[in-house]
Amino acid sequence: TKEYLVLQPNNRIGLVRGYLAEHGFVIRDEALCFENGRHYAIIRAEAGESPRLSALEQELGPVNLQKRPSLLASYARHRLKVHESILYTMEQGEIRGEAYGFSQGMVRSIQHYLEEAEDEGI
């Protein structure tokens, strides 16, 4: 039997996916669920060589983007709100820098994904 990890990160899921890819793990499966007003992402990973993940793949999940589960649009809108909130907080504190630029880019990427998904009727 093959050994694997099952992970359900509560926050900073993009960093978890990025860490897995950079440290000898490949994401084999993912699941999304929505319960009690919260989104949850579950990752199944195993040892192996992973392709480099784009920022959007890290944020929404490479398997999710490929399989397009029914909750993906809702999850993407949730992640969009998270990054918009981060930007708002940083703007209120007049904070700029790498983290600000990352969240700006993520907002654009998720908005673009949602527009494409809507155009495709997903």
Label each PLM-derived region with a short phrase.
Residues T1-I122:
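Class I S-adenosyl-L-methionine
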